[in-house]
């Protein structure tokens, strides 16, 4: 499936990952076994944490979100909610997503969520994510899904 296309490679990546055999569980995080992103008006995506696998299963349109390459439900080990300004680009409803200026967000993994801050050094640079102690976050090894959440819809995201 698509997840296999982007498996860990021997190259410099955009993220910092935990060392082999190390699991990241945010100490002071809020419970995030279910994360609903009601800010998306069409597909209403959400994630459900599977404690057995340590992964989040993704859903949308009221059902499992399935990878068309292998017919398996999409899963991820880490979710990053990146809060961004998203003004209308034109009269057709297209959004001009600001993925450059930096902002706040959430890092979600292993049933927990913590507040983060994100920034970029340049328009084409790598996005860096920092915890409340200004340390760049380390992700659990595996798949990471980044969701852009419009600044004016942050309150529509729920955690259970």
What label would you give each PLM region?
Residues 4-160:
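A surface/extracellular/periplasmic glyco- and lipid-processing/surface-interacting theme
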